[in-house]
């Protein structure tokens, strides 16, 4: 720990690193350490079914401040530590268990509205909007922007779009789904399986319903520059945000900000 100064504050992010504070404490670190969980926390009954759940919760008490994305997640945490660790409520978000005291709170995140609105009005945003409008002037655009992750519900979204085309054929040739799936954890084998499943679904939909001048699903497995995203959002009639389980999804907020106020 030679890089640490006595008054440094350490901020740890996400579940992969829950044990880090306990390891630092074992090495003699006395700095203030905070932790923020970027995923939903399960209810106590489900949490208690996780192997070594008590070890994980004990590790969280090595932090001084623990943050969650929502009040529901915070409630799950406090209910768990009360029932499983007999934590003492000290008031004002402070809890004592495992011979340590921490502060727990909910800190929902948002977006910088002015900054994103500025991107919408910037040349790159306007150019992307115009390109989309020119290319898809005859069709309604549905837009999805996600990381390639099993929690985002992408197969279910694609199947729902296929169901729309099957049940309401009048929408054929009049609606296009643009789905961006940014690469994520490509070295993990399971994520390669996810990618192949998505590509297979998109291919089957396009083969079943596509025409010479219409591709129902335009699927892009790449990252789109942030400066261009507002133009894509603004061109869309509908944004599809369909996670199976998610934290604070910012796509819905960005989509609203990107719309033309007129």
Question: How does the language model describe each region?
Answer:
Residues 1-262:
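Catalytic cores of carbohydrate-active enzymes across secretory and cytosolic contexts
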